[in-house]
From Swiss-Prot:
Record's protein name: tRNA (guanine-N(1)-)-methyltransferase
GO biological process per UniProt: tRNA N1-guanine methylation
Sorted UniProt keywords: Cytoplasm, Methyltransferase, S-adenosyl-L-methionine, Transferase, tRNA processing
The keyword tRNA processing is assigned to this record: yes
Family listed: Belongs to the RNA methyltransferase TrmD family.
Compartment(s) where it occurs, according to its Swiss-Prot or TrEMBL record: Cytoplasm
Organism: Aster yellows witches'-broom phytoplasma (strain AYWB)
Length: 242
């Protein structure tokens, strides 16, 4: 997987690429991350890449030519071009999984100021937002996408690790505990110490459903449940009504 990021703040990504899973994925060559400074593609002697908005308006807009010229240089037939924008689809685990499994070359455009010249949109394959709020620039959102996608690339982390993550199976993750077993009467559920893997699996399934029902019931609306999950969910609802 090659991920290329077009930004006016290339130094923003330095520490990100030198930390944790991203650093390991780069060292193991599971992913390549290339940062492109948009200002290099400016024809202005001051390397300016923004300008005032035609028709009037507050703020500055990132110009079309630098984005266009950069894309002309790095885009290939295999590229998937993503614009980070508050107007885009809300990014979720399904997007992350699809990008990790189906794409080999992602180009991420980071917007700033009032956004980008609308002419760039005809070269975009997807507009993505990380939430219904506005950030100063797309750089923070870019790190969210890169992190979420990279950890799903085969070989970056153990498959079992992400298969049990919240949202990967359409449910929130069950509660987890570690040592000590008892601390000032705050105890770990005894079933987790039983060694009975079937009961532990069932407990985790039930707790996952319970947490999802209580915190994110919207996730259950379109979730296709197994017969076991349907039975457990019915039990949970009955217990909560008592």
């Amino acid at each position: 997987m090659i991920i290329e990021i077009i930004t006016i703040f290339p130094s923003f990504f330095k520490s990100f690429c030198e930390t944790s899973i991203i650093k390991r994925a780069l060292e193991q060559k599971k992913v390549q991350i290339k940062i492109h400074d948009l200002r290099i593609y400016s024809s202005n002697k001051h390397n300016q890449v923004d300008d005032s908005v035609y028709g009037g308006g507050v703020g500055m807009l990132l110009s079309f030519p630098p984005f266009f010229d950069c894309l002309q240089k790095i885009k290939t037939p295999q590229s998937k071009v993503i614009l980070l924008s508050p107007q885009g689809q809300i990014f979720n685990q399904i997007h992350a999984t699809n990008f990790a499994q189906k794409e080999t070359h992602l180009i991420i455009l980071c917007g700033n100021y009032e956004g980008v010249d609308a002419r760039i949109l005809q070269y975009i394959d997807a507009e993505i937002s990380i939430g219904d709020y506005v950030l100063t620039g797309g750089e923070i959102a870019a790190t969210v996408l890169v992190d979420a996608i990279t950890r799903l690339i085969p070989g970056v982390i153990k498959e079992q690790s992400y298969l049990e993550d919240s949202h990967q199976q359409g449910l929130l993750k069950y509660p987890q505990y570690t040592r000590p077993q008892n601390y000032f009467n705050h105890v770990v559920p005894t079933i987790l110490l039983s060694g009975n893997h079937a009961k532990i699996r069932s407990w985790r399934q039930k707790e996952s459903l319970k947490k999802t029902l209580q915190k994110r019931p919207d996730l259950l609306e379109n979730k296709k449940l197994t017969l076991e999950q349907t039975k457990l969910l019915k039990e949970i609802k009955q217990e909560l009504q008592k």
